[in-house]
Curated annotation (Swiss-Prot):
Belongs to the QueC family. The gene is queC. This is 7-cyano-7-deazaguanine synthase. SUPFAM superfamilies: Adenine nucleotide alpha hydrolases-like. Its EC number is 6.3.4.20. The lineage of its organism: Bacteria, Pseudomonadati, Campylobacterota, Epsilonproteobacteria, Campylobacterales.
Length: 225
């Protein structure tokens, strides 16, 4: 039965929504989990709730707002840093990086999967078109899967079907799934939380790194597919 249940890290963005629709066609039961970590773009949680309702999938929010008190990121509400610069703790990373965020998310998803009797966790991470975050890479995902299973005596799989897809390929995947319109109009990616301006690729400020990646991907999708 556990092979038929999947727990998904769900932000309401392009990646995780495409993933949720993909998973709903492959698993008997899918559970969506969002995280409130005091992010500036908390509007994504509202989008996630609406999308979960549209997809008729159960959705839980886990509170992690303590993160802004123990580490640095320009994504936190208490930060006045402008997104687009180097991280104060590591100059090789963008300041939108939240240290250990994915490690925390995945650890909690792993615990929840055990409670549900699920043997699958699905993540919308990609190292093809990503924001320079090391915790989105395949080697990290494989390592934490191994570590958590060792620590829990489990065999839970972490599934990452978007790992080597570009944003353009993700738009094509959404089209193939019959969900392109939903991805464009309902998902949220913008770090600034902008939901007033609808571009061809979706809502957003059009300037932040997240919007730039999404815009570039959509333009490539239109040109290639």
């Amino acid at each position: 039965m556990g092979q038929e249940i999947c727990v998904i890290s769900f932000s309401g963005g392009q990646d995780s929504t495409t993933l949720a629709i993909w998973a709903a066609k492959r698993f008997k039961k899918v559970y969506l989990v969002g995280f409130d970590y005091a992010q500036k773009h908390s509007v994504e949680l509202e989008c996630a709730q609406k999308i979960a309702s549209l997809l008729k999938l159960p959705y839980e929010i886990i509170q992690l707002d303590f993160l802004e008190n123990i580490t640095h990121s320009a994504l936190f509400k208490n930060s006045n840093d402008l997104i687009g610069h180097s991280h104060v703790q590591n100059k090789d990373l963008p300041n939108s990086f939240v240290p250990n965020r994915n490690a925390i998310f995945i650890t909690l998803l792993h615990s929840y999967a055990q409670k549900l009797g699920a043997n699958n966790i699905a993540l919308g991470v990609s190292q093809a078109d990503f924001s320079g975050y090391p915790d989105c890479k395949e080697d990290f995902i494989k390592s934490i899967e191994h570590a958590l299973n060792l620590g829990s005596n489990t065999t839970i799989k972490i599934v990452t079907p978007l790992m080597f897809l570009s944003k353009a390929q993700e738009f094509q995947m959404a089209k193939d799934l019959g969900a392109l319109d939903l991805i464009i109009k309902e998902t949220h990616t913008c770090y600034q939380g902008e939901r007033k301006i609808l571009h061809a690729y979706g809502y957003g400020c059009g300037e932040c790194l997240a919007c730039q990646l999404r815009k570039k991907g959509y333009e490539e999708f239109q040109a290639r597919f």
